[in-house]
Amino acid sequence: MRLNEFYTHSVCAPTRAAFLTGRYAFRTGSDWRSEDFGKPSYLAKLGLKLAHNDRGEPTRRIHALDTEERTVAEALQEAGYFTALLGKWHLGEWLPEHLPMGQGFEHQYGHYAWGIDYYTKTIVHNAPARFAVYDWHRNQKPAKEDGYATDLIAAEAERVIAARKNDDRPFFIYVAFNAVHGPLNPPPGFDGDPNDPMAIRHAMLKSLDQAVGRVSKAIDDNGFRDNTLFIFTNDNGPVLEELSKPFRGTKNTTFEGGVRQPAILRWPGHTKPGTSKDGLMFVADFFPTFITLAGGKHEQKRPIDGIDQTAWLFEDGESKRNEIAFDVSGSVRLPTIRVGEYKLMGDVLYNIRKDPSEQTDIAATHSDVVSKLRARVTSLGQERPPLGHKPLLMDPPLPYVYGSDEQKDVPPWLIEAVKEVRAKQPTEWAPGETPWPKAPKGAVASKMDGLKDELAK
Protein backbone atom coordinates (compact mmCIF):
# COMPACT_ATOMS: atom_id res chain seq x y z
CA MET A 1 0.00 0.00 0.00
CA ARG A 2 1.37 3.38 -1.03
CA LEU A 3 0.84 6.68 0.79
CA ASN A 4 0.46 9.51 -1.71
CA GLU A 5 1.04 12.44 0.63
CA PHE A 6 3.64 11.28 3.12
CA TYR A 7 5.98 13.99 4.41
CA THR A 8 9.16 14.41 6.42
CA HIS A 9 11.47 17.27 7.27
CA SER A 10 13.86 18.27 4.49
CA VAL A 11 17.10 16.81 5.89
CA CYS A 12 18.09 13.62 7.64
CA ALA A 13 18.64 14.33 11.35
CA PRO A 14 15.44 16.39 11.80
CA THR A 15 13.40 13.64 10.17
CA ARG A 16 15.00 10.95 12.32
CA ALA A 17 14.35 12.96 15.47
CA ALA A 18 10.71 13.44 14.49
CA PHE A 19 10.34 9.74 13.71
CA LEU A 20 11.81 8.63 17.02
CA THR A 21 10.09 11.19 19.27
CA GLY A 22 6.84 12.02 17.51
CA ARG A 23 7.77 15.70 17.82
CA TYR A 24 8.71 18.40 15.33
CA ALA A 25 12.46 18.75 15.02
CA PHE A 26 12.49 22.34 16.25
CA ARG A 27 11.22 21.15 19.63
CA THR A 28 14.30 18.94 20.06
CA GLY A 29 16.81 21.36 18.54
CA SER A 30 17.37 18.90 15.72
CA ASP A 31 16.24 21.15 12.89
CA TRP A 32 19.76 22.49 12.41
CA ARG A 33 21.75 21.78 15.52
CA SER A 34 22.19 18.10 14.74
CA GLU A 35 25.89 18.32 14.04
CA ASP A 36 28.78 20.77 14.31
CA PHE A 37 31.11 20.18 11.39
CA GLY A 38 33.71 22.60 12.71
CA LYS A 39 33.71 24.69 9.53
CA PRO A 40 33.91 28.36 10.60
CA SER A 41 31.97 29.73 7.60
CA TYR A 42 29.15 27.23 8.16
CA LEU A 43 29.01 28.00 11.86
CA ALA A 44 28.86 31.72 11.08
CA LYS A 45 25.77 31.05 8.97
CA LEU A 46 24.17 29.60 12.11
CA GLY A 47 25.31 32.51 14.27
CA LEU A 48 27.95 30.41 16.02
CA LYS A 49 31.72 30.47 16.42
CA LEU A 50 34.17 27.61 16.35
CA ALA A 51 34.22 26.05 19.81
CA HIS A 52 37.39 25.73 21.90
CA ASN A 53 37.97 23.53 24.92
CA ASP A 54 39.51 24.62 28.22
CA ARG A 55 42.98 24.01 26.78
CA GLY A 56 42.28 26.45 23.97
CA GLU A 57 42.12 23.74 21.31
CA PRO A 58 39.52 24.10 18.54
CA THR A 59 36.89 21.39 18.80
CA ARG A 60 33.27 20.68 18.00
CA ARG A 61 30.09 20.97 20.00
CA ILE A 62 28.22 17.81 20.83
CA HIS A 63 24.76 17.88 19.32
CA ALA A 64 22.41 15.02 20.07
CA LEU A 65 18.87 14.06 20.85
CA ASP A 66 18.07 15.07 24.43
CA THR A 67 18.05 12.04 26.71
CA GLU A 68 14.88 13.40 28.32
CA GLU A 69 13.04 12.75 25.06
CA ARG A 70 11.05 9.53 25.04
CA THR A 71 11.87 7.59 21.89
CA VAL A 72 9.58 5.15 20.14
CA ALA A 73 12.21 2.48 20.89
CA GLU A 74 11.85 3.18 24.61
CA ALA A 75 8.06 3.13 24.33
CA LEU A 76 8.13 -0.22 22.55
CA GLN A 77 10.67 -1.65 24.99
CA GLU A 78 8.20 -0.77 27.74
CA ALA A 79 5.60 -2.76 25.79
CA GLY A 80 7.86 -5.82 25.76
CA TYR A 81 9.51 -5.43 22.36
CA PHE A 82 13.01 -6.31 21.24
CA THR A 83 14.46 -3.19 19.61
CA ALA A 84 17.33 -2.80 17.15
CA LEU A 85 18.89 0.04 15.17
CA LEU A 86 20.78 -1.08 12.07
CA GLY A 87 22.52 1.48 9.88
CA LYS A 88 22.62 5.24 10.24
CA TRP A 89 21.82 6.91 13.59
CA HIS A 90 22.69 10.63 13.19
CA LEU A 91 21.25 11.76 16.51
CA GLY A 92 24.44 11.90 18.54
CA GLU A 93 27.86 10.41 17.90
CA TRP A 94 29.89 10.92 21.06
CA LEU A 95 28.50 10.44 24.57
CA PRO A 96 27.17 6.95 25.38
CA GLU A 97 23.84 8.28 26.60
CA HIS A 98 23.29 9.85 23.18
CA LEU A 99 24.01 6.68 21.22
CA PRO A 100 21.32 4.18 20.18
CA MET A 101 21.72 1.86 23.16
CA GLY A 102 21.23 4.85 25.43
CA GLN A 103 18.03 5.80 23.62
CA GLY A 104 16.05 2.57 23.81
CA PHE A 105 17.73 0.19 21.36
CA GLU A 106 18.85 -3.20 22.66
CA HIS A 107 21.00 -3.91 19.61
CA GLN A 108 23.02 -1.48 17.47
CA TYR A 109 24.93 -1.90 14.24
CA GLY A 110 26.21 0.66 11.76
CA HIS A 111 27.34 4.26 12.04
CA TYR A 112 26.51 7.17 14.30
CA ALA A 113 27.02 10.20 12.05
CA TRP A 114 25.84 11.40 8.68
CA GLY A 115 27.60 10.27 5.50
CA ILE A 116 29.97 7.33 5.76
CA ASP A 117 32.36 6.07 3.10
CA TYR A 118 30.78 2.76 2.10
CA TYR A 119 34.12 0.92 2.06
CA THR A 120 36.46 2.54 4.59
CA LYS A 121 33.66 3.18 7.15
CA THR A 122 35.06 6.63 7.87
CA ILE A 123 33.26 9.95 8.09
CA VAL A 124 35.35 12.34 6.04
CA HIS A 125 33.01 15.36 6.24
CA ASN A 126 34.38 16.80 2.97
CA ALA A 127 36.75 18.31 5.51
CA PRO A 128 40.44 18.72 6.30
CA ALA A 129 42.23 15.45 6.93
CA ARG A 130 42.30 15.89 10.70
CA PHE A 131 38.51 15.43 10.88
CA ALA A 132 38.38 11.97 9.30
CA VAL A 133 37.09 9.48 11.88
CA TYR A 134 36.13 5.80 11.94
CA ASP A 135 32.41 5.20 12.37
CA TRP A 136 31.35 1.56 12.21
CA HIS A 137 30.13 -0.19 15.34
CA ARG A 138 28.31 -3.21 16.71
CA ASN A 139 26.68 -2.70 20.09
CA GLN A 140 28.73 0.48 20.46
CA LYS A 141 32.14 -1.10 20.01
CA PRO A 142 34.32 -0.61 16.90
CA ALA A 143 33.52 -3.22 14.27
CA LYS A 144 36.24 -4.24 11.82
CA GLU A 145 34.41 -5.45 8.74
CA ASP A 146 35.24 -5.48 5.06
CA GLY A 147 32.55 -4.96 2.49
CA TYR A 148 30.06 -2.46 1.14
CA ALA A 149 27.99 -0.72 3.82
CA THR A 150 24.63 -1.36 2.16
CA ASP A 151 25.35 -5.09 1.91
CA LEU A 152 26.66 -5.27 5.47
CA ILE A 153 23.53 -3.64 6.89
CA ALA A 154 21.32 -6.05 4.95
CA ALA A 155 23.34 -9.02 6.23
CA GLU A 156 23.04 -7.80 9.82
CA ALA A 157 19.28 -7.42 9.36
CA GLU A 158 19.09 -11.00 8.13
CA ARG A 159 21.00 -12.22 11.20
CA VAL A 160 18.94 -10.19 13.66
CA ILE A 161 15.63 -11.26 12.12
CA ALA A 162 16.63 -14.94 12.09
CA ALA A 163 17.60 -14.71 15.76
CA ARG A 164 14.09 -13.58 16.64
CA LYS A 165 12.87 -17.16 16.15
CA ASN A 166 14.56 -17.92 19.47
CA ASP A 167 12.96 -14.94 21.21
CA ASP A 168 9.27 -14.86 22.09
CA ARG A 169 9.18 -11.08 22.17
CA PRO A 170 7.74 -9.04 19.30
CA PHE A 171 10.33 -6.86 17.58
CA PHE A 172 10.91 -3.34 16.29
CA ILE A 173 13.85 -3.26 13.89
CA TYR A 174 14.76 0.14 12.46
CA VAL A 175 16.90 -0.50 9.37
CA ALA A 176 18.35 2.85 8.32
CA PHE A 177 20.36 2.30 5.16
CA ASN A 178 22.86 5.04 4.38
CA ALA A 179 22.28 4.60 0.64
CA VAL A 180 22.01 6.61 -1.48
CA HIS A 181 23.51 9.34 0.68
CA GLY A 182 26.93 10.61 -0.36
CA PRO A 183 29.76 10.01 -0.79
CA LEU A 184 29.15 8.45 -4.19
CA ASN A 185 30.73 5.02 -3.75
CA PRO A 186 29.65 2.54 -6.43
CA PRO A 187 28.80 -0.95 -5.17
CA PRO A 188 30.95 -4.00 -5.93
CA GLY A 189 30.74 -5.08 -9.54
CA PHE A 190 29.95 -1.60 -10.86
CA ASP A 191 30.78 -1.57 -14.57
CA GLY A 192 29.55 1.91 -15.48
CA ASP A 193 31.43 5.14 -16.05
CA PRO A 194 33.27 5.99 -12.79
CA ASN A 195 33.16 9.66 -13.82
CA ASP A 196 29.38 9.71 -14.27
CA PRO A 197 27.72 10.54 -10.92
CA MET A 198 24.28 9.59 -12.21
CA ALA A 199 25.50 6.16 -13.25
CA ILE A 200 26.95 5.68 -9.77
CA ARG A 201 23.72 6.86 -8.12
CA HIS A 202 21.69 4.43 -10.21
CA ALA A 203 23.98 1.56 -9.20
CA MET A 204 23.75 2.57 -5.53
CA LEU A 205 19.97 2.70 -5.80
CA LYS A 206 19.84 -0.75 -7.36
CA SER A 207 22.05 -2.02 -4.54
CA LEU A 208 19.66 -0.48 -2.01
CA ASP A 209 16.68 -2.08 -3.73
CA GLN A 210 18.35 -5.48 -3.52
CA ALA A 211 19.18 -4.92 0.16
CA VAL A 212 15.58 -4.02 0.99
CA GLY A 213 14.53 -7.18 -0.81
CA ARG A 214 16.87 -9.19 1.41
CA VAL A 215 15.27 -7.73 4.54
CA SER A 216 11.77 -8.44 3.26
CA LYS A 217 12.74 -11.99 2.32
CA ALA A 218 14.27 -12.57 5.76
CA ILE A 219 10.96 -11.65 7.36
CA ASP A 220 9.11 -14.05 5.08
CA ASP A 221 11.61 -16.91 5.32
CA ASN A 222 11.63 -16.83 9.12
CA GLY A 223 7.84 -17.04 9.40
CA PHE A 224 7.11 -13.45 10.38
CA ARG A 225 5.38 -12.24 7.22
CA ASP A 226 1.77 -12.34 8.40
CA ASN A 227 2.29 -10.53 11.69
CA THR A 228 4.91 -7.95 10.71
CA LEU A 229 4.26 -4.41 9.52
CA PHE A 230 7.00 -3.69 6.95
CA ILE A 231 7.53 -0.04 5.99
CA PHE A 232 9.82 1.48 3.39
CA THR A 233 10.29 5.25 3.23
CA ASN A 234 12.95 7.96 3.09
CA ASP A 235 14.15 10.82 5.30
CA ASN A 236 14.44 13.64 2.73
CA GLY A 237 14.44 14.39 -0.97
CA PRO A 238 17.33 13.99 -3.43
CA VAL A 239 20.18 16.45 -3.92
CA LEU A 240 19.35 16.91 -7.60
CA GLU A 241 16.17 18.53 -8.85
CA GLU A 242 16.31 16.20 -11.83
CA LEU A 243 15.65 13.33 -9.43
CA SER A 244 12.77 15.13 -7.70
CA LYS A 245 10.54 15.31 -10.78
CA PRO A 246 7.64 15.86 -11.07
CA PHE A 247 8.15 17.85 -7.89
CA ARG A 248 10.21 20.98 -7.45
CA GLY A 249 13.15 21.40 -5.10
CA THR A 250 15.76 19.23 -3.43
CA LYS A 251 16.97 18.04 -0.09
CA ASN A 252 17.44 20.95 2.32
CA THR A 253 14.48 22.81 0.81
CA THR A 254 10.85 22.70 1.84
CA PHE A 255 9.59 22.43 -1.72
CA GLU A 256 7.72 19.18 -2.33
CA GLY A 257 10.88 17.67 -3.79
CA GLY A 258 12.57 18.06 -0.42
CA VAL A 259 9.83 16.89 1.94
CA ARG A 260 7.44 14.60 0.07
CA GLN A 261 8.63 11.01 0.25
CA PRO A 262 7.71 7.58 -1.04
CA ALA A 263 6.08 5.43 1.64
CA ILE A 264 5.16 1.78 1.14
CA LEU A 265 3.48 -0.34 3.82
CA ARG A 266 3.04 -4.12 3.79
CA TRP A 267 1.03 -6.01 6.40
CA PRO A 268 -0.82 -9.04 5.03
CA GLY A 269 -4.48 -8.97 5.99
CA HIS A 270 -4.33 -5.27 6.80
CA THR A 271 -2.91 -3.65 3.65
CA LYS A 272 -3.94 -4.54 0.11
CA PRO A 273 -1.17 -4.84 -2.50
CA GLY A 274 -1.36 -2.32 -5.31
CA THR A 275 -3.55 0.15 -3.42
CA SER A 276 -2.82 3.69 -2.30
CA LYS A 277 -4.17 6.22 0.18
CA ASP A 278 -4.69 9.93 -0.27
CA GLY A 279 -4.36 12.12 2.81
CA LEU A 280 -1.67 13.86 4.81
CA MET A 281 0.72 11.92 7.00
CA PHE A 282 3.87 13.18 8.67
CA VAL A 283 6.78 11.03 9.80
CA ALA A 284 6.07 11.87 13.47
CA ASP A 285 2.72 10.09 13.12
CA PHE A 286 4.48 6.74 13.23
CA PHE A 287 5.30 7.34 16.92
CA PRO A 288 1.74 7.14 18.33
CA THR A 289 0.66 4.72 15.61
CA PHE A 290 3.33 2.20 16.56
CA ILE A 291 2.50 2.55 20.24
CA THR A 292 -1.16 1.83 19.54
CA LEU A 293 -0.32 -1.22 17.43
CA ALA A 294 2.02 -2.50 20.16
CA GLY A 295 -0.49 -1.96 22.93
CA GLY A 296 1.89 0.46 24.62
CA LYS A 297 1.36 3.51 26.80
CA HIS A 298 0.79 6.89 25.19
CA GLU A 299 1.17 8.89 28.39
CA GLN A 300 4.44 10.85 28.64
CA LYS A 301 5.86 14.10 29.99
CA ARG A 302 6.44 15.94 26.73
CA PRO A 303 3.56 16.45 24.30
CA ILE A 304 3.91 15.08 20.79
CA ASP A 305 3.00 16.44 17.38
CA GLY A 306 2.41 13.00 15.89
CA ILE A 307 -1.16 11.83 15.27
CA ASP A 308 -2.29 8.23 15.68
CA GLN A 309 -3.14 7.13 12.14
CA THR A 310 -3.95 3.51 12.94
CA ALA A 311 -7.61 3.71 11.93
CA TRP A 312 -6.90 5.55 8.66
CA LEU A 313 -4.06 3.26 7.63
CA PHE A 314 -5.63 -0.08 8.44
CA GLU A 315 -9.37 0.57 8.57
CA ASP A 316 -11.72 2.97 6.79
CA GLY A 317 -11.93 6.71 7.15
CA GLU A 318 -9.76 9.71 6.44
CA SER A 319 -6.41 10.94 7.68
CA LYS A 320 -6.62 12.87 10.92
CA ARG A 321 -3.84 15.25 9.86
CA ASN A 322 -4.54 18.61 8.27
CA GLU A 323 -1.35 20.52 9.15
CA ILE A 324 2.41 20.02 8.88
CA ALA A 325 5.05 22.52 10.05
CA PHE A 326 8.15 21.75 8.01
CA ASP A 327 10.30 24.56 9.42
CA VAL A 328 9.78 27.50 11.75
CA SER A 329 11.75 30.65 12.49
CA GLY A 330 15.29 30.06 13.72
CA SER A 331 16.07 27.40 11.13
CA VAL A 332 18.47 27.81 8.20
CA ARG A 333 15.46 27.23 5.92
CA LEU A 334 12.35 29.31 5.28
CA PRO A 335 9.49 28.94 7.76
CA THR A 336 7.12 26.61 5.94
CA ILE A 337 3.73 25.22 6.86
CA ARG A 338 1.03 23.28 5.08
CA VAL A 339 -2.61 23.49 6.17
CA GLY A 340 -5.09 21.59 4.06
CA GLU A 341 -4.37 22.23 0.39
CA TYR A 342 -2.23 25.32 0.99
CA LYS A 343 1.49 25.58 1.72
CA LEU A 344 3.20 28.80 2.78
CA MET A 345 6.97 29.07 2.25
CA GLY A 346 8.15 32.40 3.55
CA ASP A 347 5.99 34.82 1.54
CA VAL A 348 5.09 32.35 -1.21
CA LEU A 349 1.82 30.42 -1.24
CA TYR A 350 0.99 27.31 -3.24
CA ASN A 351 -2.13 25.21 -3.60
CA ILE A 352 -0.50 21.78 -3.39
CA ARG A 353 -3.56 19.80 -4.44
CA LYS A 354 -3.99 21.82 -7.63
CA ASP A 355 -0.32 22.65 -8.17
CA PRO A 356 1.85 19.85 -6.70
CA SER A 357 4.83 21.01 -8.79
CA GLU A 358 4.67 24.43 -7.10
CA GLN A 359 4.83 26.55 -10.22
CA THR A 360 2.27 29.24 -9.37
CA ASP A 361 2.54 31.58 -6.40
CA ILE A 362 -1.01 32.53 -5.40
CA ALA A 363 -0.14 34.69 -2.38
CA ALA A 364 -1.31 37.91 -4.05
CA THR A 365 -4.83 36.56 -4.59
CA HIS A 366 -5.13 34.72 -1.26
CA SER A 367 -3.97 37.26 1.31
CA ASP A 368 -6.36 35.87 3.91
CA VAL A 369 -4.80 32.41 3.64
CA VAL A 370 -1.31 33.90 3.81
CA SER A 371 -2.19 35.80 6.99
CA LYS A 372 -3.71 32.74 8.63
CA LEU A 373 -0.81 30.42 7.82
CA ARG A 374 1.83 33.00 8.70
CA ALA A 375 0.22 33.56 12.09
CA ARG A 376 0.19 29.81 12.70
CA VAL A 377 3.81 29.14 11.74
CA THR A 378 4.91 32.20 13.72
CA SER A 379 3.04 30.94 16.76
CA LEU A 380 4.70 27.54 16.47
CA GLY A 381 8.11 29.18 16.14
CA GLN A 382 7.58 30.88 19.47
CA GLU A 383 7.40 27.42 21.06
CA ARG A 384 11.03 26.71 20.16
CA PRO A 385 12.90 25.88 23.40
CA PRO A 386 16.04 27.84 24.34
CA LEU A 387 19.46 26.47 23.47
CA GLY A 388 20.13 25.67 27.09
CA HIS A 389 23.29 25.62 29.13
CA LYS A 390 26.93 25.74 28.10
CA PRO A 391 27.35 23.25 25.25
CA LEU A 392 29.20 19.98 25.68
CA LEU A 393 32.40 19.74 23.68
CA MET A 394 34.02 16.78 21.95
CA ASP A 395 37.23 15.80 23.73
CA PRO A 396 39.68 14.88 22.38
CA PRO A 397 38.96 17.33 19.57
CA LEU A 398 40.20 15.00 16.83
CA PRO A 399 39.26 11.42 17.76
CA TYR A 400 40.07 8.35 15.72
CA VAL A 401 36.65 6.84 16.32
CA TYR A 402 33.22 8.16 17.27
CA GLY A 403 31.98 7.22 20.73
CA SER A 404 33.80 8.63 23.75
CA ASP A 405 34.11 5.21 25.39
CA GLU A 406 35.41 3.67 22.17
CA GLN A 407 38.04 6.39 21.83
CA LYS A 408 39.51 5.47 25.24
CA ASP A 409 41.08 2.25 23.97
CA VAL A 410 41.48 2.48 20.20
CA PRO A 411 42.78 -0.72 18.57
CA PRO A 412 45.88 -0.39 16.36
CA TRP A 413 44.05 -1.54 13.21
CA LEU A 414 41.60 1.34 13.57
CA ILE A 415 44.31 3.97 14.03
CA GLU A 416 46.10 2.76 10.92
CA ALA A 417 42.87 2.72 8.93
CA VAL A 418 42.08 6.32 9.85
CA LYS A 419 45.63 7.49 9.17
CA GLU A 420 45.44 5.97 5.71
CA VAL A 421 42.25 7.91 4.97
CA ARG A 422 43.60 11.14 6.44
CA ALA A 423 46.66 10.92 4.22
CA LYS A 424 44.40 11.26 1.18
CA GLN A 425 42.24 14.11 2.47
CA PRO A 426 42.70 17.83 1.71
CA THR A 427 44.38 19.89 4.41
CA GLU A 428 41.92 22.78 4.40
CA TRP A 429 38.19 23.31 4.09
CA ALA A 430 36.68 23.69 0.64
CA PRO A 431 35.48 27.23 -0.14
CA GLY A 432 31.87 28.20 0.54
CA GLU A 433 29.49 28.09 3.49
CA THR A 434 28.37 24.49 3.48
CA PRO A 435 30.34 21.47 4.72
CA TRP A 436 28.86 19.23 2.03
CA PRO A 437 30.55 18.26 -1.22
CA LYS A 438 29.98 20.28 -4.36
CA ALA A 439 26.94 19.34 -6.40
CA PRO A 440 27.65 16.71 -9.05
CA LYS A 441 27.73 17.65 -12.71
CA GLY A 442 24.23 18.35 -13.96
CA ALA A 443 22.89 19.51 -10.60
CA VAL A 444 20.03 21.96 -10.59
CA ALA A 445 20.27 23.46 -7.13
CA SER A 446 17.29 25.40 -5.80
CA LYS A 447 17.85 29.04 -5.00
CA MET A 448 16.44 28.35 -1.56
CA ASP A 449 18.94 25.77 -0.39
CA GLY A 450 21.98 28.04 -0.25
CA LEU A 451 24.06 25.66 -2.35
CA LYS A 452 25.85 26.66 -5.55
CA ASP A 453 26.55 24.49 -8.55
CA GLU A 454 30.22 25.34 -8.80
CA LEU A 455 30.60 23.19 -11.88
CA ALA A 456 28.20 25.42 -13.80
CA LYS A 457 30.65 28.32 -13.69
Label the predicted regions:
Residues M1-N4, E78-A84, Q103-E106, N166-I173, ...:
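Loop/turn elements at helix/coil->beta-strand transitions in domains of secreted/extracellular proteins
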Residues M1-A17, G22-R27, F82-A84, Q103-Y112:
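Short, structured active-site-proximal loop/turn typified by the sulfatase FGly-forming signature C/S-X-P-X-R
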Residues Y7-V11, T59-R70, A143-I153, D196-A211, ...:
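A short beta-strand-to-alpha-helix junction
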Residues E106-H107, H111-D117, P238-L243, R248-E256, ...:
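C-terminal cap/loop subdomain of S1 sulfatases and analogous C-terminal strand-loop tails that border
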Residues L95-G104, P183-P188, D193-M198, K217-H270, ...:
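Histidine-centered active-site microenvironments of extracellular/periplasmic hydrolases
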Residues E35-F82, L91-R169, F177-P188, I200:
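Formylglycine-dependent
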Residues R2, F286, R333, V339, ...:
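Long, internal low-complexity/basic segments
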Residues C12-G22, E93-P100, T120, V239-E242:
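Pocket-flanking alpha-helical
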